Amino acid sequence: MSPTPVPDAEPARADAPAGPFQTRAGAYALIVDGGRVLLSSWQGPEHLVWTLPGGGIELGESPEEACLREVWEETGHTAELTGLLGVTTGTIPAEKRLRGEPLPLLTVQVLYTARITGGVLRPEVGGSSTDARWFDLAELSGLRTASWVTEALARAGVAA
């Protein structure tokens, strides 16, 4: 199965139509340990998608703070950021927005590497993710994953 953007985001293009749009910035952690990667799931409008632990950056919060908070919320683990992999972008057309939003959405994902420092694996309670799980890297080809999972693994030089 090929990577699927969340939710059905398309890569940003220089020839994208001009006009008003909204922006959502998020921060995500690639956590690899012993040939396994930690992922959290998100129920999209059409299917379940596995993604890196992470999510939206709140007002007044740094990307680093958001990333660590989201890892805790979605997985039950505390973590330490170990590196910056880079930034990716995508576009979700207005007609594919979740709650019928009238404007397209530019998504910006800040990607980090991290390592677990504590906590116990558990799914998020009352949040946007539905599960958290370690996967062997070899299992990833059979999963529906967000596009930035593949991007983060490639940037980190980790073969899936």
Model-predicted segments: where are they?
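Short, well-ordered beta-strand micro-motif
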Residues: 31, 111-115, 134-136
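Conserved Nudix-box catalytic region and its N-terminal flanking loop in Nudix hydrolases
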Residues: 33-77
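A short coil-to-beta-strand element that immediately follows conserved catalytic motifs
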Residues: 78-87
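Nudix hydrolase/Nudix homology domain
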Residues: 42, 47-50, 120-160
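Acidic, metal-coordinating catalytic segment for phosphate/diphosphate chemistry
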Residues: 1-30, 101-102
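Active-site-adjacent beta-strand/loop module that shapes the phosphate/pyrophosphate-binding cleft
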Residues: 89-121
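Short connector loops at helix/strand junctions that flank enzyme active sites
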Residues: 24, 32, 45, 52, ...
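A generic structural micro-feature
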Residues: 19-23, 49, 100-108, 126-129
